[in-house]
C-alpha cells in the first residue's frame, strides 16, 4: 500500500472510530453552545499529512497518556478500510456538493470533560493538559494559534469544537505570557491525578477519564511571573524569572473606580506583584482632571467601574479618560448603590451588606478595620476587588493593613497633577513617550528592581516637610563625603541581585501561604531559596561590619536608621532565616527536573512524613533490586544478570536473540512480559517486578505529594515572618534610592540647595535644565531671582521671540523645585529654595477630540482647576493663555486671569508667558516690583535688502523688559517655509503695522486739534498724554 493511501486510511480511521475504541488524545477543538457562530473549517489539504510515530504519540497512542493500547486500534484498521470513501484520499468536497452536517456520535469521556470545562469557563481561554501537552480547543484555538504562530489542527474532524492547537508542557509559562499580553483571561487546566495513583487507590472506575481541574486563572495584571517552571535556566542563573512582570518600569495596577455621583469619586488601586493598595476620595468636574491625574500615576491595565443604581453605564467623560490613558485597558462595569445621598438607615444596610461579603474572604478583625477606617464608597471598591481577585487567588493582598496608603497625603507629599507630569516630562517624554529625556531617567540609577519601584514613588510624590528633605540631602552629602567600605560592599551586593525582585518574591510567598492547591503556587522552590539565602547574606555582611557601622559619623538620620535596623535584625533575628535554610538540601540546586527538585528540596530528616515515604520507596526498591533480581538470576541461570533501563522503562532484563529460543519455555512459564524487541536483543520484565514497580511508582508519587504539602506548610511559616523580611527589603530599597540620587548629584556642577521654609524664594545662580543639558552640552545657563519675602517678583511676565527659550526657562524653575523636594542636588552654582506644596502648569496647545473639547476649552478647564486648587504655597506656570480664541477675547481673558492671581488672597508664585504685549501694563499697575516684565534675550541683525526680514540670534538668557515682536516669520523661515511665502507675509506684516501707526497718528491729530480749539480748557491729564505720545514717537524715530 502506498504511503499516501496508508495515511488516508489512518486519517479516516481517526474520524470514524467507535467511542469504545477511541482515545482521549484524538480530540480537537471545543466551542461551547453559547459561543458566537464559528467560521467554516478550513478545507483539507490536497494531500494528507504524514503521521510519523512521534505524531501518533502526540495523539496519545503510547499507552501512558489517557489512551488505550495501540494494538486495539490496529486490529480495527481493516474494518475501517472497508468503510473508506470511494473518493481519493487527497480530494475534498467538490464545489457543487453540499456541505454535510457532522454526524451525531457518542462523545468519549475526555470529549465530555472538555465540553464541561469550557461550558463552565466561557469567559476565558483554557489551556488543558493532556499528556505532555497543553491544548486549546474550539474557536479559542484559532486565536491562540495566531498569537503563538503555531499550527491549527483539524485532522479532518468535522466538529470544529475539537479542532485544536497545542504547546509543550515545559513551555507553558512562556506561551502563557504571550497570550496574556494580548489582553485575554487564561485558565490553566491540569491533570490532578496520575495513572498509577488511580490504579493503586482505585479512586474511580478504570474506564473514567483522568481528573482535570482549573488550577490557575491569569490576566496581564494578575500574572506574577514564572511560578512553576523550575526547569528554566534563567530562573536560576539569571535570577530573572523571580518576577517577569516586575522588570517593567511601569507597575501594572488593577483599579476600582466608584462613580458616587457626577462630581464625587472613590478609587482603590492594587498592585498584585508587591501587594500595594492605594485608596482615595475626591471631587472632579466634567474634564476629569483629578481622575486623569490618578490614572497617570497608576497606569492601570484593568479597571472596574462602579456606577450608582440609577446609571446603567459608565459616564462618557470617565470612559473617555480611561481610553486616553490606556486604550488597551480592560474595563469592567459593575452596578453599585453608592449611598452618598442616602439616609442613615440606607448607609447602615449598605455597610452590613459590604461586611457580609468581606467576611467571606477576611477575618473578623480585618473586616472591622475596613469598616471603621474607610467610607462606604471606598468599602464598595474593596468589596468588588475582593470578588474580582478571588478567582485569581489574590485576596490575600488585603490582609496586610500596613501596605494600604492614601494617594493624597497632603501632609507629607506634593501631588503633581496630570498636566504637570506631562509638561515637565517627569516619567516619559512628549515626543515618543519613552523614558529618554525624562526626569525619572536622569534620577534612576538604582541597582535593583524594588529600588527602582520605590524611586518612582519618590519622584511622583515630592516631600513637603523641610526636615524630611534635609535628611535626604544630608544622606547624599554623607555618601559623597568619603569612601566607605561598608557602603561599597552593600552597593556591590545590590548590584549582584539586580534581577532578583525580593519584594515581589515576598508577596508571592504571602499569596501562596493560604493557597491549598499545590498545583497553583505563586512561587517555586528556587525562588524561595534565593530569597532566604540573599536575606541571610546581607545580614551576615552587616554583622561583619558591626564595628564600622557603630563608628559611623553619618549626620543623616535616614542612613543611621537604615544601618541600625539592619544591624539589630542581624543580631537578633538572623537565626530565623538560618533555621529555614537549615531545612533545605542544597543538592536540589543541581537538579534539572522539577520532580527531582521537589523530592530533594528538603533534607530527609527535616520532616517525618517525607522520611516515611523514603522508607516505603526503599522497601520496594529492595524487593525489586535484590530479592526479585536474585529470583530472575536463578530462573534464567545467569548469576551476573543486571537490570537495564531504556527509553524511560526501568528494571528490564536483556536477552540476546540467539539465546531466546533456549529460554522461551522458562520465559513463558515464569510470566516474563515482552517489552521491546530489536534485531539483536529482546527486553523483558518479570510480572512480579511489574507489580512491585507499580507500588514503587505509587510511593514515588506519594513522596512528591508529601513534599508539596510540606512545602506549602513551609511557605505558611515563612509568611508568619512577613514583617521581618519586609523590613530588611524596605531598608535595602531606601538605601538603593539614596545611592541613585547620590549618583545624579555627583554629576559635574551639581550643588546642594539651601532650604527656606518661611517663603517661596527661588534664588538660583547659573541654573540649567537638568534633562536638556544631558542632550545638549552647550546649554545656556540662567539666573533665577524670585524672592517674595517682601512681596517682590511674585509674578513674572515673560515675553520674547518664538523659540527664544521661554518654555525651557519656566520648566527649569519647576524641575529644580521638584528635584529639590525629591531630595536631589541641583544643576547650578548655588541655590536657595523655598518649599512648595503644589505645582500647576498650563502649557501647550492640547485639544481632546475624544472628550469633545477644543484647545480653548481644555485651556479654560485647566485654568479653572488651577484657580480652584491653588494654595499659598503654589507655583503656577501659565503659557500663552488666551491664544486658542480671538485676539480681543484672548487678551481680555489673559489679563483678567493674571490679575486675579495677582490679587488672590493665596498669593501664589506665578510665571506667565505671553505674546500679548499689552499685558505688560500690569507692571505699572502694581508698585514695589510685585509684577516684573522679563524677556528672553536675542540680537536682531537688520537686512538691507528691501522686503527681507531681519535676522535674529537667540541668546537664551533672561533679561528685564518687554518685547513687542515675536519674530514668528523667523521661525517660519527656520521651519523651511517657502521664501516667497515669507516675503509676502513680511509685506503684510509691515502694512498692518503701518496701518496701526496711521490710526494712532490720526487719533493723536484729533486730540491735538481738539486741544487747540478749546485753548486752555484742556485738562492737564489730556495734555500729558499728548506730550507722552509725541515724546514716544520722537524717540522711536
Curated annotation (Swiss-Prot):
GO cellular component terms given for this protein: nucleus
Disordered: annotated segments: 1-107, 229-249
Biological-process GO terms, alphabetical: mismatch repair; mitotic recombination
Known partners and oligomeric status: Heterodimer consisting of MSH2-MSH3 (MutS beta). Forms a ternary complex with MutL alpha (MLH1-PMS1).
Annotated Pro residues bias: 36-47
GO molecular function: ATP binding; ATP-dependent DNA damage sensor activity; double-stranded DNA binding; mismatched DNA binding
Taxonomy of the source species: Eukaryota, Fungi, Dikarya, Ascomycota, Saccharomycotina
Annotated ATP binding sites: 800-807
Record field: compositional bias (Polar residues): 1-30
Protein name in UniProt: DNA mismatch repair protein MSH3
